[in-house]
Amino acid sequence: MTWRDAAIDHAKLMAPNESCGLLIDVAGDTVYCACRNLADDTDHFIIHPGDWAKAEDEADIIAIVHSHPDQSPDPSAMDRQFCERSQLPWHIVNPADGSWGKCIPLIGRQWVWAISDCWTLVRDWYALHGLLLPDWD
C-alpha cells in the first residue's frame, strides 16, 4: 500500500472530520503515519503532539497530510500560512474523489520549470497574502 492509499483510507475513516497525518522517511521509503486530530470542529485539524513526537522518534518528518472531506483539495489561505510556518510540504486529499492538492513552503523549494519555478513562487507568495493570480498560459 502506498502512502497515498493509506492517507485516503484514513481520510475516509475520519470523515466528515478532517484527517491528519505525517509523512516520514524510513530508509528511503515514504511512510504515512495517521495522527489524531484534536480540533473541535470538522473543518480544521490539530495534530496530537504525542503522535508528532512518536513519528519524529521513528524517522525524519518530511511532510504533513490532511483532508478536505467536503471541498476541493486546493490549499486554503490558512493551509498556506501554516505550511509556511511548518517549513514542510503539505499534501491535501479529498477522500470522496481521491483528488490531491499540495502546498510547498516558499523557502527551500526545488526549482522545476512550470511546476515550482519563479512564476509559481511569485504566485504562491501573493496567494499567501490573499491575492490569487492566474497561472500563465
Model region roles, listed by residue range:
Residues 1-63, 70-102:
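Conserved beta-strand-loop surface patch within small alpha/beta domains used
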Residues 16-21, 66, 117-121, 126:
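Residue-level signal for functionally critical sites in structured catalytic/ligand-binding pockets
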Residues 95-137:
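N-terminal capping segments
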